[in-house]
């Protein structure tokens, strides 16, 4: 076996480093855990995927120190940027007399802080410089200069980039690895297996060999026409004797050799050239250089380190040619030999190095054949594109400029490089607007793996196989967390313990087992390596010495097969039961009892939870909450121990043990990308002692340093008067009044004052035709004051724009002369609160050219207003649990009408029982039981005979748990049904000495309206409920008048366009079914697009007359025009058969409108933006 470490030279990607263990986090809240398996290692740093990859790209000092430590002092270590500069250098002119080399990339300090970059809409970037050395080979002259390449976006410590003021994430891409792939297809006519092999480089032409149904071996170069494979071998200089000597064992190769029709190398080269470049006149030299450039020249062909590693492993070529990034004749010959042996049905072959290698086809969906392009490599590829564009410019300038006066700076044009970087961050499919809905959504976004994007798959072409869960995903990519919809299976999430190796393959850790005994050795294995071992699961029983106690053990073999083997045959064991799932999925308690489809929804909906005004940690957790919040980067963590000196709402000052004062500024009520509120709250008090690594302030959606996205609510499973039919939810009014599910949402409104052709726009309080009442909240500049309560239509910023000058009347000229400029024509273009929005102004930012702010060309002033809205839970809002159990609030009942327990406690929420059985997410019921136990507490007497079975599995620290405790039931290693049943029988009584919930988890509930008990006991307990981002306030919409489409003259559609409701085909059928002909005619004409009719109706209503008859709808006229455009002569005939002219009513329309002084047919251009 070739170990990945042995073939490493040049680009070295960092391996994930161990981060702080959960048990080491000082001040962490106490959770009572039901875990039976203790993991030998902690979860690696959850952001290492991003941070380490970027550290490799720019070569940070910390990264270099880690590499020196791992590979020894003498090892040659190059960063990603150094690699591409080495690849590119030297750039020579066409004659070879001059060359330019680039080296030593280095960064100056970042220009702006992260907050400044966000505020000013600029990039968080550092200037990049390289050393450029120009050599004139004829004179021997060397000129060296430092060249500025451009501002290079830098990653923040949270793994994000700030581009144009917004936070973005670069998602890692899953692509097929370069290498050699053998494939089998069945011929439809003969039903015989046909075999093919593809040699796929990182960059360059594909080389494909295949055996067709006539048993001839062919080759395709760069997807061009097929030709006999012996033609290629002869073109490489092989004689017939050499071919016979190497492939004489194969009849199909010999028959191909006899029928190839070329006698020698020259003929073979010309034949290849004709196939590759049909229509061009071939010469031997041209043909030879075409073949050399295609596969044997590093400029045109690059296998990359990973491609060379994969080819050597597959074909058993040893490690002698590790540094070679092009193909060799031996690669080609061995690939052909492997193919013909595979076709002959052989199972093993001897490689050129004498190694016995298996002969088998490859599974392209196997994670041994798919690798990750992480952020560093994606940016590196983009810089390479920019530098290759720059290289062309440098070559041209070398030939055109005077050799004596050339300097490196005169040759280099850095525009292509900075443009390529800007294009990648701004427009690439893999550079995404960060999901900041809550802490978990940001964390999982950074750990996302996408098979889409440039060089990847497209969602239209991707089949079922590539989307499906594969055995090699185990411990590498989560089988649960993926989007629903067209991207299912193409976008995944990194498993919790996984890391990326230097080649981009995902590795997962296993614990070494030798002769049935566990060792402390942890090996990270790729999917390829894992296939050769026998792996037991994490919950395999072993004694205190680590010896496996079961004689036969359930294990996983190659291709995911499950078998029972002797304990001495086990090679490895999983490190943790949650090894196969992602961070988001690992936060679903009792995941093992949920159907995978519902678990997928649960994992995805946690990312949609909005942070609440008051967070609350879940009674039932999984133990992952602390670590997820800690690594997400939204908590404030002190790096040094000390004493808290001062605490306010937004500043914490700590005097550390060295006598140095550290000040931490908290972020208060800032807007996130999704419009939720980002707010940090201090957790420490003045005089507290804090340790290094302690959480001193909570972020959004965290509580005491734990991820806390929802609230614990007392839930009853029962139907209630049909109000919770079809997943509707009934809530207690108390939840609204106590602000239990209240969230804060912040909207940003922006307006700028520009120079127009008619003069400059002005931000002012002096707005024409507006009463003082409307201006009451504006300051003297015309900007709304902070703290003002605003609702839709209120002015936030007053602005006037010059109107077009018209011919002035004598009276206006007189006014102009008396009052000066004041009487000039301006129109009100103030920024108003959009339709349907209300809130309180919490911030105003003003940027002005006078203050030297960097504004876009033509903009003199820009104002941003932040409006915060407190949204209480209401009918129509969406709530969900963590098990995919989602629903919409259907009714909010007064507290006195809710069912209540015998001690008078009303339930918070009523869920329908029908939501459980067919969805098979039983985890929600178990969570409810354990939630009740955590809230009530329990006490187990180990001496009591009824607890004999319970104490066999229950950890000793769980015998006595107080009320209101937090519990952890890790996925696949949590509380069992028997434990829950046993604990329910031992739950603590309430203060009156009564036990409310029986041993079966049910209670007698009393109807709040009648005071009568319900006839059957009801399942009751605490469930953790999330309020999702799908809020009814953002969806509800109504329109009276508004913009029309210019073509059809019908109202626009959708809330964003302030559109109307579509009365569609099916609605028309309903009207027809009821025979409501006149109502239907009205809907399709005067209420929609009968332009003349709708004005006349308005006129009739104003004048108190009868409604006139409808005319012809505009959409009918459009239909006629479309038919005429297809050269069909369409006429409208009257009842007596005479042709009618449709376009004659406009005069009536104009007169009616003019007489009323209105124009109802406003088009979308003028109105859609103001609506």
Swiss-Prot record:
The answer to whether keyword Transferase applies is: yes
Record's keyword annotation contains Transcription: yes
The first-level EC class reads transferase
Instruction: Please name the InterPro entries in this protein's record.
Output: DNA-dir_RNA_pol_bsu_ext_1_sf (IPR042107), DNA-dir_RNA_pol_bsu_external_1 (IPR019462), DNA-dir_RNA_pol_su2 (IPR015712), DNA-dir_RNAP_su2_dom (IPR007120), DNA-dir_RNAP_su2_hyb_sf (IPR037033), RNA_pol_bsu_bac (IPR010243), RNA_pol_bsu_CS (IPR007121), RNA_pol_bsu_protrusion (IPR007644)
Q: Name one GO cellular component term.
A: DNA-directed RNA polymerase complex
A Pfam cross-reference name = RNA_pol_Rpb2_2
Q: Name one GO biological process term.
A: DNA-templated transcription
Q: Which CDD domains match?
A: RNA_pol_B_RPB2 (cd00653)
One of the entry's Gene Ontology molecular-function terms is: ribonucleoside binding
Q: Which domain of life is it from?
A: Bacteria
Enzyme Commission designation: 2.7.7.6
Write out the catalysed reaction: RNA(n) + a ribonucleoside 5'-triphosphate = RNA(n+1) + diphosphate
UniProt entry keywords in alphabetical sequence: DNA-directed RNA polymerase, Nucleotidyltransferase, Transcription, Transferase
The similarity annotation says: Belongs to the RNA polymerase beta chain family.
Function, as annotated = DNA-dependent RNA polymerase catalyzes the transcription of DNA into RNA using the four ribonucleoside triphosphates as substrates.
HAMAP family registered for this protein in UniProt: RNApol_bact_RpoB (MF_01321)
Subunit description: The RNAP catalytic core consists of 2 alpha, 1 beta, 1 beta' and 1 omega subunit. When a sigma factor is associated with the core the holoenzyme is formed, which can initiate transcription.
The identity of this protein, by name, is: DNA-directed RNA polymerase subunit beta
Instruction: Give the organism the record lists.
Output: Corynebacterium efficiens (strain DSM 44549 / YS-314 / AJ 12310 / JCM 11189 / NBRC 100395)
